[in-house]
Regions:
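Positively charged, small/polar-rich N-terminal and surface patches that mediate targeting and assembly
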Residues: 1-118
């Protein structure tokens, strides 16, 4: 059954980094999605960009001759504002300890439809 949910305030947490960034031995995006699932966050999606730049101001783009591409990546999480604020507090120190830069934003969002899969 599909439901429209607006009982709580929802937000979208975005972590913008690079496809090659790591936490320990794991890729950052893999680590964050697995941690979000373990913490019960409603949804997580990873988007890989074809071009972009961040805090280093160096433009990164897709090149067919490169085996390992350093491309922009956005990890997007959606859940209640309270759960996402708690999740961010848990990962903040790990993000700060990374040698490379990242950008984290959070914005309110409205869930129009949430249908569970089988």
């Amino acid at each position: 059954m599909a439901t429209k949910t607006q009982d709580s305030k929802y937000s979208r947490l975005k972590i913008k980094a690079s496809t090659t960034d790591k936490i320990g031995s794991k890729l950052l995006y893999q680590y964050l999605v697995e941690k979000a699932k373990a913490e019960g966050i409603s949804g997580a999606t990873v988007f890989r960009g074809i071009m972009g730049y961040g805090t280093s101001s160096k433009i990164h783009s897709s090149r067919f001759w490169e085996l390992t591409e350093k491309l922009p990546v956005v990890i997007e999480l959606v859940d209640t504002t309270d759960k996402l604020e708690k999740f961010f507090k848990e990962i903040e120190e790990e993000l700060l300890s990374m040698p490379k830069g990242c950008l984290v934003t959070m914005e309110p969002t409205e869930i129009l439809l949430q249908k569970k899969g089988k």
